């Protein structure tokens, strides 16, 4: 039986529940029942599994037992956090009617909907990570993509041209929740993601989207945002905005504009590159030993989030990058001092979002007040800094003296968590509130006086006055003296050793006190809403200030990191090439216990490709990755881990580094490797930086060497990209002799007996040998296996040396040794002196057949 079949056969309470559930069929409905939120039917079963709570039954309705699960109302946020992390959504249904006046079930309604992408509550968010809601649209023209961070109001759109670019955007933004149309075709792109929401096609209708967006921004058209013709992106943005309005059920004044993100504005990195460079997530899925882990010592959560956005979106605008470099240089002397007041500013960005949604809690307002109190000190520290970008940011940080004064007068020093707890509004702010509070607070004095008076008047030494949450105020007398109480004492409660009474005077006072407490709380709630009304008109300036403070935090952090980690300011040139003196890997140098060996690198139009050889563990991958990371850091405006660096124009960074089977998609290591290689060969340009590590190792020697040769040749001669090409195929070291713009470098090692010492130093020229067996021994491969391998190596080297010299050129090359025909192998194995005449004749026929 479906839950809503034959509604009339259910109890009135279950009828109410089923009507509400019908409005939210796809998400869990938490239905308030006294001190619990309860879930019924299929919701109860799902919640029991997801939240690990007991599944029970609650009586019967329509003749069937009702599956039920529940959580205490005061623990709801903990359970919502777990649901959100699992990509689930929930509707919170509260009692809004008065039980005393209700006929039948108390009136209830859904007051908020919690989804992974629309949360703004501090308890549900990770403070140092963006939490994005996204929507995707796809048709024959390409993709439309929109993201919104409801906790900041940051609204972005893009139009990725193809599947690879869309995959890179999804990895970069990593949305907590993704809306997609019901006819979406490339499901392989999104099917493994959490928080997927299938939406009807009409929600992506273009005209409706434009209308919704103009209504939100208070504009007649979208030309001012530069998105009027971005039809694919606008479809996604319209669906996203409607979804937010449906779930938040309030106005969204902090969402005030839309920004178009264009590929050409930044350095493009595909999904594989972001993963391989371990910017914010390591290859194991954690955050340890990533670039962000080393670079992010920001003192505010909003600064930390901005830094990670910069890491994932390196830009090409030299003017902006120069501004950032100059700001970092200007802040180095005061970075530590500036971080002290910035730390006290806290997460102003998200507090303002909760203010806009009218969900800010008392402690949010106290934190806002504390942030305002830091602004004069920030101004004092920054005013002497003669750097245009610093002064521009400072001009965006207003000093909100009036708002600070309002919050200092209105909010107590240490407010409670919730307004409903009372005691949020400070004494002296509102005379009427003070009067009602005085009445409620005077209860203690009155009760003390009443107790003394009654005890002396009646001569009952066990008499005392108290309060109980269930029965209210009472006069308690021991059982032994209860027969002495006067007739106007009305029994209210009997205990084992005492009786409790009420008298008209106490009852009258009880009504007065309870009324005063209720009245005081009602006035407080009204005043709290009024404070919102006084703050909200200043929201645009507040958001501008919060954004500027976040950027100042990022720049001060980068200044501190540059000083502490010995980074230098790179030169950004308009001439092609990369020249690095004393370059270091920013993460590896911090993790290593021994000193990191720095290395130079030169790429130019005359030296476009480096063929990198050397032993495993010698540092080839580190050398390649550090180059990409130095380029990336330079294009986010940061100083870099090098003695000196000059970086020319870069449009893309590609990495083909390492690989593993993609079991989820049914792709082998080699297939993953070739897919990434194809992407590079199709999309790289002269201004791209390409890292190719051990290409072709996932197949046979001949196939692998052929592919590696052809790829290197293509990158060097046709594409002319700046390429670092690490390989174990020593045949490739002859490429510089045959092609212009190609050079050999190697990482050296010293072998002593069966031990090996890696020098980690990059030298010009090709490596002399591979040291593979020494590395195997170092890894713990048994000695007898190493010994047998050395024997086999000598045999193979002997065969190779005795064979005809290989001739390798671009059109035809002999790879290692030609394959030996079976007839030749048979002849080599034959001992003619041991054959009889008959056997010799048989061998002639056999060899004839082989040939």
Curated annotation (Swiss-Prot):
Q: Mind telling me which InterPro entries this protein's record contains?
A: DNA_mismatch_repair_MutS, DNA_mismatch_repair_MutS-lik_N, DNA_mismatch_repair_MutS/MSH, DNA_mismatch_repair_MutS_C, DNA_mismatch_repair_MutS_clamp, DNA_mismatch_repair_MutS_core, DNA_mismatch_repair_MutS_N, DNA_mismatch_repair_MutS_sf
Q: Name one Pfam family in it.
A: MutS_IV
SUPFAM superfamilies to which the protein is assigned, alphabetical? DNA repair protein MutS, domain I, DNA repair protein MutS, domain II, DNA repair protein MutS, domain III, P-loop containing nucleoside triphosphate hydrolases
The protein's name: DNA mismatch repair protein MutS
Task: Give an example GO molecular function.
Answer: mismatched DNA binding
Q: What is the top-level taxon of the source organism?
A: Bacteria
Organism whose genome encodes this protein: Yersinia pseudotuberculosis serotype O:3 (strain YPIII)
Protein task:
This protein is involved in the repair of mismatches in DNA. It is possible that it carries out the mismatch recognition step. This protein has a weak ATPase activity.
